[in-house]
């Protein structure tokens, strides 16, 4: 089954479907625009469920601010890695190459960096040089704004707006060594109104590395357009946690739209 001709540069590869688990104090939480967080379950149990459903990868985002709960995240990653045998990406609160080393030792395969990399861009190169570009995922929380590209970077889980052009920052980070872009639309996050396709296309045009589309998935027919806009993978949270769809449902919809998926 051929992939859509409008897909990104990795179109000959299978599209990845990635559940995202936001973790606070050892529990998965969900909300809209990072607000009004509600408990959604045990992270290890959910990770195992999604693995059994056929997820291609898993992403954990540590949304906890305290040092005490940070240690809990290492335990979550370690326990998950013992039961789930697909790539694990972990982000949130990563501020140094030593943080990366500890997460990798706990069982993570890739590490997402966001606010800390904006504050100190050299962090991207430090991670890539020490562990390889494939480990360094630049996570971007993006909103519409008055910049050349029309997209602005936010920090601290979308709560702080910057004046940084999102496309320019993504391009710079890739030059510094980022091996993948996790592109999350703050405007669409949790709304279930669909991915921001203009944002996905802008990131695809600016980058040679894989692009993961995030934010806005709500219907099965939302996923294929994100791939057609240039994404290599699609990430979602609330539609999986609420049992609205399974991973298999999403892969079926992608296959029906002509995309290659792993079964």
Swiss-Prot record:
Reactions accelerated catalytically: 5-[(5-phospho-1-deoxy-D-ribulos-1-ylimino)methylamino]-1-(5-phospho-beta-D-ribosyl)imidazole-4-carboxamide + L-glutamine = D-erythro-1-(imidazol-4-yl)glycerol 3-phosphate + 5-amino-1-(5-phospho-beta-D-ribosyl)imidazole-4-carboxamide + L-glutamate + H(+)
Keyword match Ion transport: no
Organism: Clavibacter michiganensis subsp. michiganensis (strain NCPPB 382)
Pathway: Amino-acid biosynthesis; L-histidine biosynthesis; L-histidine from 5-phospho-alpha-D-ribose 1-diphosphate: step 5/9
UniProt GO molecular function: imidazoleglycerol-phosphate synthase activity; lyase activity
Name under which the protein is recorded: Imidazole glycerol phosphate synthase subunit HisF
EC number in record: 4.3.2.10
GO cellular component assignments: cytoplasm
Family: Belongs to the HisA/HisF family.
Function noted in UniProt: IGPS catalyzes the conversion of PRFAR and glutamine to IGP, AICAR and glutamate. The HisF subunit catalyzes the cyclization activity that produces IGP and AICAR from PRFAR using the ammonia provided by the HisH subunit.
Gene3D superfamilies, per database record: Aldolase class I (3.20.20.70)
Subunit structure: Heterodimer of HisH and HisF.
Keyword terms: Amino-acid biosynthesis, Cytoplasm, Histidine biosynthesis, Lyase
Subcellular location: Cytoplasm
Enzyme class: lyase
Active site: 22, 141
InterPro entries in UniProt: Aldolase_TIM, His_biosynth, HisF, IGPS_HisA/HisF, RibuloseP-bd_barrel
Subcellular location, principal: cytoplasm
Example GO BP: L-histidine biosynthetic process
């Amino acid at each position: 089954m051929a992939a859509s001709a409008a897909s990104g540069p990795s179109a000959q590869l299978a599209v990845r479907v990635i559940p995202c688990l936001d973790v606070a104090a050892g529990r998965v939480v969900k909300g809209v625009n990072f607000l009004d967080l509600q408990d959604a379950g045990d992270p290890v149990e959910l990770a195992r469920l999604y693995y059994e459903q056929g997820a291609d990868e898993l992403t954990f985002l540590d949304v906890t601010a305290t040092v005490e709960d940070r240690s809990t995240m290492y335990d979550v990653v370690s326990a998950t890695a013992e039961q789930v045998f697909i790539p694990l990406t972990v982000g949130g609160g990563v501020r140094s190459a030593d943080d990366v080393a500890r997460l990798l030792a706990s069982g993570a395969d890739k590490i997402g960096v966001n606010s800390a990399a904006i504050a100190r861009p050299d962090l991207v190169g430090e991670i890539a040089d020490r562990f390889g570009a494939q480990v360094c995922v630049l996570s971007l929380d993006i909103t519409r704004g008055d910049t050349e590209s029309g997209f602005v970077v936010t920090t601290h889980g979308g709560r702080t707006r910057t004046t940084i052009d999102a496309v320019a920052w993504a391009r710079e980070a890739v030059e510094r060594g980022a091996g993948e872009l996790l592109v999350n639309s703050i405007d669409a996050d949790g709304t279930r109104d669909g991915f921001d396709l203009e944002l996905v296309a802008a990131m695809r045009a600016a980058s040679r590395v894989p692009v993961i589309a995030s934010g806005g998935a709500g219907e099965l027919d939302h996923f294929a357009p994100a791939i057609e806009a240039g994404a290599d993978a699609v990430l979602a949270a609330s539609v999986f946690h609420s049992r609205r769809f399974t991973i298999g449902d999403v892969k079926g919809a992608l296959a029906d739209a002509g995309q290659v998926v792993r079964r």
